[in-house]
A protein has these predicted regions:
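Short hydrophobic/aromatic helix or loop-helix immediately within or flanking a transmembrane segment
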Residues: 92-110, 114-140, 314-318
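Transmembrane-helix motifs of polytopic, lipid-linked glycan transferases
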Residues: 134, 146-171, 344-349
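Transmembrane-helix signature of polytopic, membrane-embedded enzymes
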Residues: 142-145, 162-190, 208, 360
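Loop-to-helix entry region of an early transmembrane alpha helix in multi-pass inner-membrane enzymes
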Residues: 116-122, 126, 130, 138-160, ...
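Multi-pass, polyprenyl lipid-linked donor-dependent membrane glycosyltransferases
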Residues: 150-153, 168, 183-215, 224, ...
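Signature aromatic-anchored transmembrane alpha helix within multi-pass, membrane-resident enzymes
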Residues: 276-280, 399-428, 436
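Membrane-lumen/periplasm interface segments of specific transmembrane helices
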Residues: 57-73, 243-342, 346-349, 355-362, ...
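Membrane-interface transmembrane helices that cradle and orient dolichyl/undecaprenyl
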Residues: 175, 213-224, 397
């Protein structure tokens, strides 16, 4: 060691003493960036995100309704240029639901001179109008005000449950894309016929109950699921395909238990048998009640025939003549292309990434409505309840991230445009004759 080293250390010490106290140094600038407004928004609870998407979509649709009402002619429900509440509370099937709420169901089916059953309220299920009637009784409010408001609030609850149904029912897809539940909600809200979620129709209640049934089934709350399915059976004629979902769920649980990946005891089996029975009974309960009250065992089917171009209800029969009515010689190619597109959506990898319950519901429900309806102007509205297909659509392009965003944005813009077109073309009523939305 150099002899100068101790001296150098001493010099440093002396300098430090003679220099006096040092001035406090300025705090070092933080290197952590402040959170921007978008980061703060992303940190909000999931349900706030869902309700923001829902609120924005409902305001958008309300604007489309208000715009369309300005060109609405006088009609059987209102005068020209109806108010927003009249426009969404009285037109088309809303008028029938109002009749149910205010007058109930007839004890005798109306018939024409040939004895054929005419259009009547028995075609419209009771849960939604009776709920509104109860609120009318409690508050003294009118149908025009309360029915669209109840539907709007039910739609808010529905999208919250849709989010959770996707989160719990498609774990593999959500693990790969955590934003999938919210993307699903956005596409459901933007679906071309989602405007009905704020009119006096049953779509809001039905969407809530379908999503709740699937969520409870996935979470294995079979008793609660049975109660919800019973309510669904008195909301829309869509409880029967839920039985197929229950069977698939039971089969998957049994198979996994055989492989040691799950448990499946007698209590589980009994709960699922009861749930399947509830779905089956709920699917026929309202037609049975109609037959019992009117004294006509097939009164519900005869009532449905009154809305069809051909007076018969035979599974899939409508597809033999309706496409030609709408598209002429192009009817068959259009029908085949539509079926092919539907099958493709069910079979793409994004569909298989859904859980078995969501995947089965989409397939069973679509097959069911294709079997029982006469394909027409209401078909697109019925597809709204196949909400897991929105998750499939959002997940078609998984990566890269920029391509996924471009795809989602393009689909969203297209759907919103079609939504405005649907309101303008389908909800606006032509007094000289029109098709129901």
């Amino acid at each position: 060691m150099s002899a100068d080293a101790p001296r150098a250390d001493a010099d440093v010490a002396v300098d430090a003493v003679t220099a006096g106290p040092t001035e406090p140094s300025e705090p070092a600038p933080t290197t952590e960036p402040r959170a921007g407004w978008w980061d703060r928004v992303r940190g909000w609870p999931w349900w706030v995100h869902v309700l923001l998407v829902w609120a924005a979509s409902r305001l958008f649709v309300a604007g489309a309704f208000v715009w369309t009402a300005t060109v609405q002619e006088a009609n059987v429900w209102t005068g020209a240029n109806p108010s927003y509440q009249e426009f969404v509370g009285l037109f088309y099937d809303a008028g029938w639901y109002r009749q149910v709420a205010e007058s109930g169901y007839p004890a005798e089916l109306p018939r024409d001179e040939q004895g054929l059953v005419q259009q009547n309220p028995w075609a419209f299920f009771p849960l939604f109008p009776m709920l509104v009637r109860a609120i009318m009784t409690l508050t003294g409010g009118t149908w025009v005000v309360l029915a669209p408001t109840v539907a709007l609030l039910l739609s808010a609850a529905a999208v919250l449950v849709v989010h959770e149904a996707v989160r719990h029912g498609a774990p593999r897809a959500v693990a790969a894309r955590p934003g999938l539940p919210l993307a699903t909600v956005a596409l459901v809200c933007a679906f071309p016929t989602a405007a009905v979620l704020q009119v006096a129709y049953t779509e809001s209640a039905a969407l809530l109950l379908v999503a709740a049934s699937l969520l409870l089934l996935v979470r294995r709350r079979y008793g609660w699921a049975a109660l919800v399915v019973v309510a669904l059976g008195f909301t829309r004629a869509v409880a029967l395909p839920m039985a197929a979902v229950v069977v698939v769920h039971a089969g998957v649980r049994w198979w996994r238990s055989r492989r040691g990946e799950d448990t499946f005891g007698r209590r589980d089996a009994a709960g699922l048998v009861g749930l399947a029975a509830a779905a089956g009974i709920s699917g026929v309960a309202w037609p049975a009640i109609c037959g019992w009250v009117t004294g006509v065992p097939d009164g519900y089917l005869q009532t449905q025939e009154a809305w069809r171009g051909v007076r018969e209800v035979v599974p899939f029969s409508g597809w033999t003549y309706v496409p030609a009515f709408w598209f002429g010689e192009w009817g068959t190619p259009v029908m085949v292309a539509g079926f092919a597109l539907t099958a493709a959506v069910m079979l793409v990898p994004a569909a298989w990434r859904l859980g078995p319950e969501l995947h089965t519901w989409s397939a069973a429900y679509v097959v069911y409505i294709l079997a029982v309806i006469e394909p027409g102007s209401s078909l697109a509205r019925f597809l709204l309840l196949a909400f897991p297909l929105a998750a499939v659509t959002a997940g078609v392009v998984p990566r890269p991230a920029w391509a996924r965003r471009v795809w989602f944005g393009a689909v969203l813009v297209l759907m919103l445009g079609l939504q405005v077109l649907w309101v303008r073309q389908m909800w606006q009523f032509n007094p000289q004759g029109d098709w129901p939305p």
